[in-house]
């Protein structure tokens, strides 16, 4: 029984190591949309999902629809928005929202900010070898501004 459980865990770990995944650890819906695909024939199949609370979406790094570079270390730009009132956009550098970059086999976690801050949500990005790319504070998700307002 323990061997079967261990084998299942190894299988799960191996499969997620070959994909980038976006985890929504918030209590709100989150939209994740890949930037325009360089191959217009694949653009309609790019990653474009709305994730419910506590859910995830993954893309195997060799799938060219959602990882145009096709490698574990390819960089993919994603638009990350948190739905609700007020809406939030996540990105770095400040003012570049909603742009978040992930490697082809990395992970993005959208979660409540564990620190006391004006920004209630942050994004954590890790590479395939679990290196944290976002520093101790993470990437802040700021309140979205309506077009035409300052």
Description of each model-found segment:
Residues 15-150:
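Intrinsically disordered, low-complexity segments enriched in small/polar residues
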Residues 2-13:
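Sec-dependent N-terminal signal peptides
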């Amino acid at each position: 029984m323990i061997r079967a459980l261990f084998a299942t865990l190894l299988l799960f770990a191996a499969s997620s190591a070959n994909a980038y995944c976006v985890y929504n650890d918030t209590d709100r819906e989150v939209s994740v949309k890949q930037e325009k695909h360089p191959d217009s024939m694949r653009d309609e199949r790019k990653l474009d999902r709305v994730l419910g609370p506590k859910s995830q979406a993954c893309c195997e790094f060799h799938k060219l629809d959602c990882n145009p570079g096709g490698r574990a270390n390819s960089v993919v730009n994603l638009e990350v928005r948190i739905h609700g009132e007020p809406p939030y956009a996540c990105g770095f550098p400040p003012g570049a929202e909603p742009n978040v970059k992930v490697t082809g086999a990395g992970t993005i976690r959208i979660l409540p900010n564990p620190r006391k801050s004006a920004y209630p949500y942050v994004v954590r990005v890790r590479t395939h070898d679990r290196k944290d790319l976002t520093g101790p504070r993470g990437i802040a998700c700021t309140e979205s501004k309506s077009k035409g307002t300052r």
